[in-house]
A protein has these predicted regions:
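N-terminal phosphate-binding loop and adjacent alpha-helix
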Residues: 32-74
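Active-site nucleophile and cofactor-binding loops and adjacent substrate-binding regions
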Residues: 26, 50, 78-84, 103-106, ...
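A polyampholytic, Gly/Pro-enriched intrinsically disordered region
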Residues: 53-55, 119-135, 235-236, 262-265, ...
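Phosphate/pyrophosphate-binding loops at sites that engage ATP/ADP/AMP, CoA/4′-phosphopantetheine
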Residues: 59-78, 150-154, 199-209, 232-234, ...
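Glycine/Thr-rich phosphate-binding loops that ligate phosphate moieties of nucleotide
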Residues: 1-34, 78-116, 220, 276-519
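ATP-dependent carbohydrate kinase catalytic cores
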Residues: 189-296, 329-336, 340, 401-404, ...
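Active-site phosphate-binding/coordination module
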Residues: 45, 53-56, 69-140
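Gly/Ser/Thr-rich active-site cleft segment
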Residues: 12-14, 25, 126-247, 355-359, ...
Length: 519
């Protein structure tokens, strides 16, 4: 029997769990996707919850299906790594049992009462103009919500984890998690890549104690090994090494090969993001941290559109169900049909613009944010709306590029595109034209899973370090070149309309918010 020569990556998203097998050159050898249905429960408006065991059971189902399809594959697995959605919180009691459902990253609930910061911190944040930002940070904290609204559950909580930490415990029995998974409302020191120091204000702002949090492990290091129960659930041998990787976006950047500052990773996922990776810590937005990269001693500069390609799902559900049905009948993706329908429409959608700020933010956009469609005339069709959504997301990501370049003084000269939306040729071409840069797909759209696999490959000693592994395991796919005429049109719409559209509409959004929230 030959030595194990494959890596298992588990990618836990909001809507599905994927079990992926890669080789040492980054080729995707096998793939199973198990849907999470429903993706979450909303017992009240703004809430988003899911039973954490649903994710664990889906991992087992996906793995067992892999081995059923290719029985010899399980014996070839040398190690595994995990990547998950960010900022989904799980609380467990002393026995390790979840207390209630996991609070999803999509959740918008706010705690009515939060811990009161010492006067010195309140004064400092007020002087810096950060009082509202810190208040929002506290109110969005799942731990603070539990303390205020479910005190019995809060008192019982022995462990406060992100979904990644919960799943690491399910796999290994250890209370550990990846450094690069710590994106959420936690007392984490992003610059030092560790839990905050004892005197840090975050311990006074969030109702979490240090002993409730897991041990953190750098990417590429071993988190533990499969225990007996996990091995049985996954159909793999006891003792299989489990390596630290990172959150989905961090792994996506690594799995796209965007490991130097001049290369940007654009992720066209539920949340659309633009990231660059660098060794130096730099806050692109003032007082908004750079996140730990999925490799040691590196950080990602990230700008996000919270409701990114979620807008595509929203459009299909609300305005294009007939297209979805037609696509199912033809056994095609609905996005492929929509691509065909928008192809004849000229760049700029005949003057229809979408401002993709569908969800409020903390700083940019602010809590008043609303989405907008501007420029309707009688020539516009549903296809125009769809194209304008893709263009609006591209404009928003270009704005993110310019903020990153301005803050870091590093020009972005290369665009690697990943996420489900990258499978759309129209979305790729629009990005190339709006950015006036060549847009490159990776050889696989499973870039988060590939980023996790790179970490396992480094941990197994197959490659010297993360950048060397990325050079060997990430390969260029299809390339989309900017078209001069489209670039000129998009430049005018971006510079003359889009860049100041939010500022012009902000007072209107504030008035809408005041009226809509009035009793």
């Amino acid at each position: 029997m030959s030595a194990p020569d494959r890596i298992l990556s588990i990618d836990v998203g909001t809507q599905s769990v994927r079990a992926l097998v890669f080789d040492d050159a980054g080729a995707l050898c096998a793939r199973v996707q198990v849907p999470i249905e429903p993706p979450y429960y909303a017992p009240q408006p703004g809430h988003a919850e899911q039973d954490p065991d649903v994710f664990w059971q889906a991992i087992g189902t996906a793995c067992q299906q892999l081995w059923a399809e290719e029985p010899a594959l399980a014996t070839r697995i040398a190690g595994m790594a995990l990547t998950t959605q960010r900022a989904t919180s799980v609380f467990l009691d002393a026995s390790g049992a979840p207390i209630g459902r996991a609070i999803s990253w999509l959740d918008q609930r706010r705690a009515e009462r939060v811990p009161r910061l010492p006067a010195v911190w309140r004064g400092l944040f007020s002087a810096l103009g950060l009082a509202s930002t810190i208040d929002t940070f506290q109110r969005l904290s799942p731990a603070n919500w539990r303390a205020a609204h479910a005190p019995e559950q809060h008192t019982r909580a022995r462990h406060a984890l992100l979904l990644s930490g919960y799943l690491v415990h399910c796999l290994t029995g250890a209370w550990r998690d990846s450094v690069s998974a710590q994106v959420g409302y936690l007392p984490f020191d992003y610059k030092q890549r560790r839990w905050a120091g004892r005197s840090d204000w975050k311990w006074r702002a969030i109702a979490i104690e240090r002993d409730q949090l897991p041990e953190l492990v750098e990417p590429g290091k071993q988190l533990g090994a499969l225990d007996k129960d996990a091995a049985e659930t996954l159909g793999l041998p006891v003792g299989l090494p489990v390596f630290s990787a990172g959150a989905d976006k961090a792994c996506e950047v690594l799995g796209s090969g965007a490991v130097t500052p001049e290369t940007a990773c654009v992720s066209l996922g539920t949340t659309a993001t633009i990231n660059t990776c660098r060794d130096a810590y730099k806050e692109v937005t003032r007082f908004v941290p750079a996140y730990p990269a999925a490799m040691p001693d590196a950080f990602t500069d990230e700008i996000q559109i919270y409701r990114g390609f979620w807008l595509v799902s929203w459009f299909k559900q609300e305005f294009a169900l007939d297209t979805v049905v037609a696509a199912e009948r033809e056994q095609r993706a609905a996005e492929a049909l929509l691509d065909e329908r928008i192809a004849p429409i000229a760049p700029g959608s005949d003057g229809l613009l979408v401002l993709p700020t569908w969800s409020p933010g903390v700083r940019i956009p602010g809590p008043e944010a609303r989405g907008a469609m501007v420029g309707f005339t009688d020539v516009h069709s549903r296809a125009h709306v769809y194209r304008a959504i893709l263009e609006g997301l591209a404009y928003g990501l270009r704005e993110g590029r310019e903020r990153i370049e301005k803050r870091t003084k590093t020009p972005i000269t290369r665009l690697r595109v990943s996420g489900g939306g990258s499978q759309s040729d129209q979305a790729m071409q629009i990005l190339a034209d709006v950015f006036n840069l060549t847009a490159e797909r990776s050889h696989t759209h499973e870039t988060s899973g590939l980023g996790a696999a790179i970490n396992a490959a480094v941990g197994l000693g197959w490659h010297a370090d993360h950048r060397a592994a990325a050079r060997s395991m990430v390969h260029q796919g299809a390339v989309f070149t900017p078209r001069a005429q489209a670039v000129a049109i998009y430049d005018r719409f971006y510079n003359e309309v889009f860049t100041d559209l939010y500022g012009r509409l902000k007072p209107t959004f504030e008035r809408i918010r005041a009226i809509a929230s009035a009793p």
